[in-house]
């Protein structure tokens, strides 16, 4: 195992986002509504361009990860717009907090280290996981009953 496990973590989280996409897309039609995807493309482009000079050999893996997390977020928004259920707000907030958590992590790793980074990264990360899990567990419970 390499001493720096960042790449292993990146791949693990990428796989996790694929599972979230699978859960979020169930029961809806995937669509490419511009209201969802144009802002996400702008956000993702800005994130990548802001990080690019510090990425070195990690440019392609980070770009792929950004694409997957944006697809997860877009799917959460599409779910919210199509189902209009209260729990879909949790999916949207969870996705937004996941993007924030990962942006803070990436900025801290590849650009500038900042004080209290772990507090902000983990605080947004755990809240994101909770919100996404709540949004999907409520949906699953309603589909069963």
Predicted feature locations:
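Polytopic alpha-helical membrane-helix bundles and their juxtamembrane interface segments
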Residues: 1-145
């Amino acid at each position: 195992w390499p001493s720096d496990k960042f790449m292993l973590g990146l791949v693990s989280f990428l796989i996790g986002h694929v599972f979230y996409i699978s859960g979020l897309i169930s029961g809806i039609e995937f669509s490419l509504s511009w209201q969802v995807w144009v802002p996400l493309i702008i956000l993702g482009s800005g994130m990548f361009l802001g990080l690019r000079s510090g990425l070195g050999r990690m440019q392609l893996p980070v770009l792929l990860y950004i694409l997957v997390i944006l697809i997860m977020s877009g799917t959460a928004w599409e779910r919210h717009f199509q189902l209009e259920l209260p729990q879909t707000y949790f999916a949207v907030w969870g996705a937004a907090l996941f993007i924030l958590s990962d942006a803070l992590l990436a900025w801290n790793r590849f650009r500038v280290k900042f004080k209290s980074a772990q507090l902000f990264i983990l605080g947004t990360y755990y809240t994101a996981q909770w919100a996404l899990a709540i949004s999907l567990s409520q949906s699953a419970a309603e589909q069963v009953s």
